[in-house]
């Protein structure tokens, strides 16, 4: 019974809401009807005659001034709209109308879900947004002292942003510190050093820690920031490895004695893995690629659970340098799995391997005549898959945009990830004959399959909206961030541009041909009001004249 009463009240409420929604239409027609009936008492005809006489006495200069002023005002609105769009990526008029005017006009969805469902939906969308905008450590990040600082010395530009370096400082504190560091003087000094913003202060603290003890993290800091060459960095990392292995063995024996010992062992494990990975990267940069591959494989076997370092991406790049494509395919078979997070390295390496099988004989003219073979179709689909995951990469691989030094952190599917991938893998694409030609001929076809990438994807989730904002914080200001999808001009910018141009043209024509424009304006107004006059004549002919006479006497 209660449910029936509640349902009746809901129906009654919806009927009232519906009636109020459309009541303004009825009110509008009633007002028009009353104005027409009371046109004689209100002397509307006399007033219209007076207004028309006033307009006839106006000179063409008035119309020139009127249209010129309208053009000026619409031009100012256009300039403001364009500035607001360039700065905030949206139209000011649209934002105000949606945020403030729509609620006042009753623009509320009556079919909205319940409050609980709405709260759950907001929570799900926020979790998805956080996941999409997660920033990852760049697996192939360069050395600050030996590479980033050398770039600054030569060009005078800072390749790293403060936001990027701050994220690295947080990573160092997470990987290289633990709660028991205050018990060891050298580790206590390094705990403060990782939080220090000044590079010279960090380096001085590392030297101070080494005076007290053979501290592995102090060697890491010096290898990353003080060493000016890769050779110097490798020497320091070897010293760090010697100290780190000793700490790792000691903490491994004590890890089951309590939570503090377990945390210390976890920290020592992170330190050891980081050192070995950087040593492998040093060997790769110094040309000892086979040695680097062996070190990476051993590291992945010894610590299979530490996938957060993404060592397999370092391994893929080194194997491509050796042109060991069978080994690359074996690594992809393990990591290009639907349950594992994707990356540009995985998607584009898979596309490169499939393109390699057909690219040397591929010809767009021949393909258009005979159609694509099965192998060519597989290669094109792999390229489309890679482009859907990260649409920024092809511009760098095809050298349509200039590369910069990759940041220390990347946003997956963003411009920062595209730079990091292309910086190291462009040479591998160039080495495969015809691969870049195949990419050039096919990559734009991806966008025809996903016309609305922000709303619906094809093989992946819709493209995240947050990439542009995050990439602007990760990449230096001198780099022009790649934006996808390309933003279209808002309607109101186009409208104000058209209005400004139209009124300016009217002002010019009125000034040059005043009589002709006057005739044109009268003809336009008479044509505009012709349907209304026709309707009123029909209404007067249908209704009896006595009724009109009685209504006008009210």
Curated annotation (Swiss-Prot):
It comes from Gallus gallus (Chicken). The keyword Magnesium does not apply. It holds the Pfam family ST7. The chain crosses the membrane at residues 15-35, 62-82, 489-509, 516-536. Keywords: Membrane, Transmembrane, Transmembrane helix. GO terms for cellular component: membrane. The gene is ST7. This is Suppressor of tumorigenicity 7 protein homolog. It is a multi-pass membrane protein.
């Amino acid at each position: 019974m209660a449910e029936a009463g509640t349902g009746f009240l809901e129906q009654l409420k919806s009927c009232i809401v519906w009636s109020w929604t459309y009541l303004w239409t009825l009110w509008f027609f009633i007002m028009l009807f009353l104005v027409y009936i009371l046109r004689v008492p209100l002397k509307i005809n006399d007033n219209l005659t007076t207004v028309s006489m006033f307009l006839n006495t106006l000179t063409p200069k008035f119309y020139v001034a009127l249209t010129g002023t309208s053009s000026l005002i619409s031009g100012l609105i256009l300039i403001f709209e364009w500035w607001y769009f360039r700065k905030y990526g949206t139209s000011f008029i649209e934002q105000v109308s949606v945020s403030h005017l729509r609620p006042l006009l009753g623009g509320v969805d009556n079919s909205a879900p319940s409050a609980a469902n709405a709260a759950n939906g907001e929570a799900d969308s926020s979790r998805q947004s956080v996941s999409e905008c997660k920033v990852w450590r760049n697996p192939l990040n360069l050395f600050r002292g030996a590479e980033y600082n050398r770039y600054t010395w030569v060009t005078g530009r800072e390749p790293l942003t403060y936001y990027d370096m701050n994220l690295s400082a947080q990573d160092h504190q997470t990987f290289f510190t633990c709660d028991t560091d205050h018990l060891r003087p050298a580790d206590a000094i390094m705990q403060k050093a990782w939080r220090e913003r000044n590079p010279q202060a960090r380096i001085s603290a590392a030297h101070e820690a080494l005076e007290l003890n053979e501290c592995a993290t102090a060697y890491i800091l010096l290898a990353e920031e003080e060493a000016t060459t890769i050779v110097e960095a490798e020497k320091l990392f070897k010293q760090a490895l010697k100290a780190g292995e000793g700490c790792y063995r000691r903490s491994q024996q004590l890890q089951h004695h309590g939570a503090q010992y377990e945390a210390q062992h976890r920290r020592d494990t992170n330190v050891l893995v980081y050192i070995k990975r950087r040593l492998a990267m040093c060997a790769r940069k110094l040309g000892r690629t086979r040695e680097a591959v062996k070190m990476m494989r051993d590291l992945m076997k010894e610590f299979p659970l530490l996938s957060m370092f993404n060592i397999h991406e370092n391994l893929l790049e080194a194997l491509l340098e050796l042109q060991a494509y069978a080994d690359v395919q074996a690594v992809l078979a393990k990591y290009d799995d639907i349950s594992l997070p994707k990356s540009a390295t995985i998607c584009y390496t898979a596309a490169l391997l499939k393109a390699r099988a057909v690219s040397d004989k591929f010809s767009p003219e021949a393909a258009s005549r005979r159609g694509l073979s099965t192998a060519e179709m597989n290669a094109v689909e792999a390229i489309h898959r890679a482009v859907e995951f990260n649409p920024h990469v092809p511009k760098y691989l095809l050298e349509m945009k200039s590369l910069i030094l990759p940041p220390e952190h990347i946003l997956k599917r963003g411009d920062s990830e595209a730079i990091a991938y292309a910086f190291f893998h462009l040479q591998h694409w160039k080495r495969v004959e015809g691969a870049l030609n195949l990419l050039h001929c096919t990559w734009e076809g991806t966008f025809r399959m996903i016309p609305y990438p922000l709303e619906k994807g094809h093989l992946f989730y819709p493209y995240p909206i947050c990439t542009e904002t995050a990439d602007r914080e990760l990449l230096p200001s001198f780099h022009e961030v790649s934006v996808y999808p390309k933003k279209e001009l808002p309607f109101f910018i186009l409208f104000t541009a058209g209005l400004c141009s139209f009124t300016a043209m009217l002002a010019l024509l009125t000034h040059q041909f005043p009589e002709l424009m006057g005739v044109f304006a009268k003809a336009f107004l008479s044509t505009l009001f012709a349907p209304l006059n026709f309707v009123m004549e029909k209404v007067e002919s249908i209704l009896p004249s006595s009724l009109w006479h009685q209504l006008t006497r009210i």
